[in-house]
Amino acid sequence: MTELTAAAQRALTLMDLTTLNDDDTDEKVIALCRQANSPAGHTAAICIYPRFIPAARKALREQGTPDIRIATVTNFPHGNDDIEIALAETRAAIAYGADEVDVVFPYRALIAGNEQVGFELVKQCKQACLAANVLLKVIIETGELKQANLIRKASEIAINAGADFIKTSTGKVPVNATLESAELMMSVIRDMGVAKTVGFKPAGGVRTAEDALHYLQLADRILGEGWADARHFRFGASSLLASLLATLGHGAEPSGSGY
């Protein structure tokens, strides 16, 4: 097995296979559930809008893969600073049956100098998730924060407020996951001494098996080989799956773009 093939197999089991499109339907989400149960193994999770969770739960159960987790998004995609709305959306997502919630950090407030609202928003969403045994991922939107000091600060605030994962991006802005932002964020996890309890999720722009290999190499280098398991590392992606399957001998290499 080549290094690329091994990385492709590993990456497949770390995917949050995602559809977050305005034209999503129950049928499209059910098709996503089928894709998540691939010929080379199943993904860690799917990531969908909250209203589709019941249809996804039923589809995953009926196809015999109830262990594929269901992630959803809240305060998405704009990362507004209204804590009550973010909390209400998070509670609603939990009520729909989410296993994991990816909440958008109020990154514009941080850029404007307000660190407190982000801490409080994540803290309150974490309390709701903790009570329901739901994993909380915090999207800091690195492509909008841009500056290394802001990316580090948002990561630190999210972790201090209780994030189970820190995630790069919504996939809805011009610049999404990059290796540079990934290095900054995983270095914060290492430097804060929270590698046992906090994970990392690059999202948006991870499209090929080669891309996945580079992120996994980075994780191995910063946090140690073996750290990047499904409890500590996820890829938020859609088009990546076809590239991984092609690398593993299942189908042709895809063309075009995708999340």
Swiss-Prot record:
Q: What is its main location?
A: cytoplasm
* Assigned GO CC terms: cytoplasm
**What domain of life?**
Bacteria
Q: What are the alphabetically sorted keywords of the record? A: Cytoplasm, Lyase, Schiff base
Q: What is its EC number?
A: 4.1.2.4
Q: Where in the cell is it found?
A: Cytoplasm
**Example GO molecular function:** deoxyribose-phosphate aldolase activity
Is Lyase set as a keyword in this record? yes
What does the record give as the function of this protein? Catalyzes a reversible aldol reaction between acetaldehyde and D-glyceraldehyde 3-phosphate to generate 2-deoxy-D-ribose 5-phosphate.
Tell me the protein's name: Deoxyribose-phosphate aldolase
